[in-house]
């Protein structure tokens, strides 16, 4: 049997196993205790536990019969609101298994539905409200129409704090017989931006070929720019050594496969920590934003990043700042 993705293998199965979201858990526990609940809307960035919490709630409500009483749908995968309507109708027409008073429909990516489709969904929610509850999952609550929001208890899911992510990653690494270095945790957190699913996937990919996972292993797994490489590139460019800076850029692009957007994200992360004046940081941040915009419009990556290096060189000639040093591991 193929090995499970670690994200699925270590997905919490109960409220007690969820390491964050204390306020959300407290309110959902009250619903379980009462044996009843309204429709729910979970919103927040990817990887913040929305699907996990919905499945945990199903397990807590229904126990051994949670699969029979739960229907999972994805608004992006389904072929339109008519398919969703028919599947919900088929699911809701039978009584819940066990002593549950209602069945549960989990609809992921609800914010990807058009306004017309959401209006139709609202009517579906009303028609089957007697014996069915909906949990809608969305990245952006602003994309959900007000008539649906008004019919739901709304819960916000935030990116996991670094301390809790580190704790979870260490737990998984220990269980899998992997030595996880602190610099690897730092890089995983920065690259995942609080997305726990992405963080665990990065750890698994890095651990596939390394029993000791450090920042270099994570960078290789993610095809990401190491902080030391960004610092070196910045120092070469701002000191006016354009030839060496361009050589370093091409090495990272064509030998290590780093994409233009990844360069910009890495520069932005490191810029905050660089020991240079705030007005220079602001100027560089504006430059990064300009280059990032042109990349999103389809401009050539090498040309745009080379332009970035020349502009950094011009800033360096004007202000002559001291070079910055790589962060200590």
From Swiss-Prot:
Transmembrane segments: none
A single cellular component GO annotation: DNA replication factor C complex
Record Gene3D superfamilies: 1.10.8.60, 1.20.272.10, P-loop containing nucleotide triphosphate hydrolases
One Pfam short name: Rep_fac_C
Keyword annotations of the record: ATP-binding, DNA replication, Nucleotide-binding
Top-level taxon of origin: Archaea
Record text on subunit structure and interactions: Heteromultimer composed of small subunits (RfcS) and large subunits (RfcL).
Family: Belongs to the activator 1 small subunits family. RfcS subfamily.
Protein name as catalogued: Replication factor C small subunit 1
């Amino acid at each position: 049997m193929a090995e499970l993705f670690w994200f699925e293998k270590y997905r919490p199965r109960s409220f007690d196993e969820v390491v964050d979201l204390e306020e959300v858990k407290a309110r959902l526990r009250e619903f379980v205790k009462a044996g009843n609940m309204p429709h729910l809307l979970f919103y927040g960035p990817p990887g913040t536990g929305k699907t996990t919490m919905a499945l945990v709630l199903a397990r807590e409500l229904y126990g051994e019969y949670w699969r029979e009483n739960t229907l999972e749908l994805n608004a992006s995968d389904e072929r339109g609101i008519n398919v969703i309507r028919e599947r919900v109708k088929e699911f809701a027409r039978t009584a819940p298994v066990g002593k549950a008073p209602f069945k549960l429909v989990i609809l992921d990516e609800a914010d990807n539905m058009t306004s017309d489709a959401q209006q139709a969904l609202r009517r579906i929610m009303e028609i089957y409200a007697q014996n069915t509850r909906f949990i809608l999952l969305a990245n952006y609550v602003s994309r959900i129409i007000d008539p649906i929001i008004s019919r739901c208890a709304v819960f916000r899911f935030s990116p996991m704090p670094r301390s809790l992510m580190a704790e979870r990653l260490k737990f998984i690494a220990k269980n899998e017989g992997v030595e996880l270095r602190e610099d690897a945790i730092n890089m995983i957190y920065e690259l995942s931006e609080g997305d726990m699913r992405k963080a665990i996937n990065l750890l698994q990919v890095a651990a596939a070929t390394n029993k000791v996972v450090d920042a270099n292993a994570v960078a290789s797994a993610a095809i990401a720019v190491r902080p030391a490489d960004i610092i070196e590139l910045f120092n070469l460019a701002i000191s006016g050594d354009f030839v060496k800076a361009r050589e370093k850029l091409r090495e990272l692009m064509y030998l290590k496969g780093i994409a233009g957007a990844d360069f910009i994200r890495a520069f932005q992360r490191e810029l905050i920590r660089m020991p240079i004046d705030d007005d220079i940081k602001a100027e560089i941040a504006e430059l990064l934003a300009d280059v990032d915009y042109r990349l999103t419009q389809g401009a050539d990556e090498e040309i745009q990043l080379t332009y970035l290096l020349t502009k950094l060189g011009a800033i360096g000639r004007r202000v002559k700042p001291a070079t910055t040093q790589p962060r200590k591991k």
